[in-house]
Design a protein with these regions (language model features):
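Loop-to-transmembrane alpha-helix initiation sites
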Residues: 10, 86-87, 108, 137-138, ...
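Single transmembrane alpha-helix segments in multi-pass membrane proteins
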Residues: 3-55, 60, 77-81, 227-238, ...
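Transmembrane alpha-helical segments in multi-pass inner-membrane proteins
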Residues: 196-272
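Transmembrane helix-bundle core of multi-pass membrane transporters
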Residues: 85, 91-92, 96-157, 187, ...
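Alpha-helical transmembrane segments within multi-pass membrane transporters and channels
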Residues: 21, 54-94, 145-146, 248-252
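Alpha-helical transmembrane segments in inner-membrane proteins
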Residues: 66, 76, 91-118, 123-125, ...
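Cytosolic-side transmembrane-helix boundaries in multi-pass membrane proteins
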Residues: 169-183, 236, 243, 255-296
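Helix-loop-helix "hairpin" substructures at the membrane interface of multi-pass membrane proteins
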Residues: 70, 131-214
Length: 296
């Protein structure tokens, strides 16, 4: 039971980040590698703020807005400086490595085990029934993930959200509506990286420490979650894409845990497993698309 809870907990955390990747990959068709930097940015800022006595609750929205700023930088480099999308993300991701170290006080690892977090505080320790306490982490994570999902669903149904979708499908349509397609892309990248930073902040609070390598492979996990979720659950017409992405993140985490449990590979091979599963998902996804096109 504890293992299953752990899978759900990590799946929900990465689902928040995957919602951001959904914006860049599925909506904007933008290969944004800066999430590998904004994810640890949120973790570093959260750890730094909590160590300085800031409320762990306030640390999360501040982490989100830090990610928004980083996403804006990626967008400005791409739109205003005319740098290719892939390179824009790489530049910001690389720069954020140093930024994250500075935020963490030039420490590659910043623990805050003795500080309160959203998961471990006076309220969770003393005000909850004993029967609920083992599940408090997954409950809080589910609430945060669902809030992010519903906010994103709401935004995508606003005028700005429709323009964001149009910018990915047909940017000429955005121009015909007298809107700046570059500005729309910047907004999309800002929101996406905001989600990534928020997820990093949540993970840092769950682990009660920040590590500089926490963002390695974040983009791969996000892509796998988006592709797995949207491809596997696309047959359910009434299921929203954001719901499919969250389910995909949890399912992907289960796949990784299953492979490790088989003892064929070691836990230290986690990144290798992650990459291999993503490759398998991409191959199967491409095969399904070809079959669909052939039958059509």
């Amino acid at each position: 039971m504890a293992i299953l809870l752990g899978i759900f907990e990590e799946g929900l955390i990465y689902a928040i980040m995957a919602l951001g990747v959904y914006i860049t990959y599925k909506i904007l068709d933008f290969p944004d590698l800066s999430v590998d930097g904004t994810f640890p940015l949120g973790a570093a800022l959260t750890a730094g703020l909590i160590v300085k006595g800031v409320s762990p609750v306030w640390a999360l929205p501040l982490s989100f807005f830090a990610g928004v700023l980083a996403g804006c930088v990626t967008g400005v480099i791409h739109v205003k400086c005319k740098v290719r999308d892939l390179f824009s993300g790489i530049i910001v991701m690389t720069a954020l490595y140093s930024v994250n170290l500075r935020i963490a006080g030039m420490k590659a690892n910043l623990p805050f085990l003795s500080q309160d977090t959203i998961f471990d505080n006076e309220w969770t320790r003393n005000s909850l029934p004993a029967s609920v306490r083992p599940y408090i982490v997954v409950i809080i994570l589910a609430v945060i993930a669902l809030i992010c999902k519903f906010v994103l669903d709401w935004y995508l149904n606003t005028r700005s959200g429709y323009l964001l979708r149009a910018a990915g499908d047909n940017d000429a349509l955005v121009t015909s509506l007298a809107e700046d397609k570059g500005r729309v892309k910047i907004i999309g990248l800002a929101i996406a990286n905001g989600f990534a930073a928020l997820a990093g902040g949540v993970l840092a609070q769950k682990q009660a420490f920040f590590d500089i390598s926490i963002g390695t492979g974040t983009m791969v996990f996000g892509l796998a979650s988006v592709i797995l979720g949207t491809q596997l659950f696309h047959r359910f017409g009434k299921l929203k894409a954001t719901t499919a992405v969250i389910a995909g993140a949890i399912l992907y985490k289960e796949c990784v845990a299953f492979v490790i449990s088989m003892r064929i590979v070691k836990a230290t091979d986690l990144k290798l497993i992650t990459a291999a599963i993503l490759l398998l998902i991409l191959i199967v996804s491409d095969s399904m698309k070809r079959k669909g096109a052939h039958h059509a």
